[in-house]
């Protein structure tokens, strides 16, 4: 990462890392759906360790679960000290991406097949995050209606 990405302490801004996560999640979502996609939500962006100027950053994305027109993409960010080759897991994020047709409307996307134990775990956890998001939305709407 370069100096333009950093604050005055030499840490890469969190917003720069978030932008990378969004870009890579979008690529994974397009590859899976074959459609244009938009970001609908970003859940639990966790910054575990700082990224410093001069480190190499690797961003990996996996489609964890698919619903009718949306999917959850898990993103893992790692930084590497190029002098020592030490690799550190620095950030994790979960993004909900929505596939769009040519008219900009949500469109159905193909399911994924969770085969391995890890894929099944990711799919279960994605469903829990989705259920929590939808329940929170419902609670907020009910609260707004009472006000």
Give residue ranges: language-model regions:
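Surface-exposed, Lys/Arg-rich phosphate-binding patches that contact polyanionic backbones
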Residues: 5
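Conserved G/P- and acidic residue-centered "switch" motifs that form tight phosphate/ATP-binding loops
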Residues: 13
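Short amphipathic
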Residues: 1-2
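Small beta-barrel nucleic-acid-binding modules, principally OB-folds
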Residues: 34-52
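Active-site helix/loop of acyl-thioester processing domains in fatty-acid/polyketide metabolism
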Residues: 16-34
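HotDog/MaoC-like acyl-thioester-processing domains
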Residues: 52-56, 64-147
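Anion-recognition interface
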Residues: 10
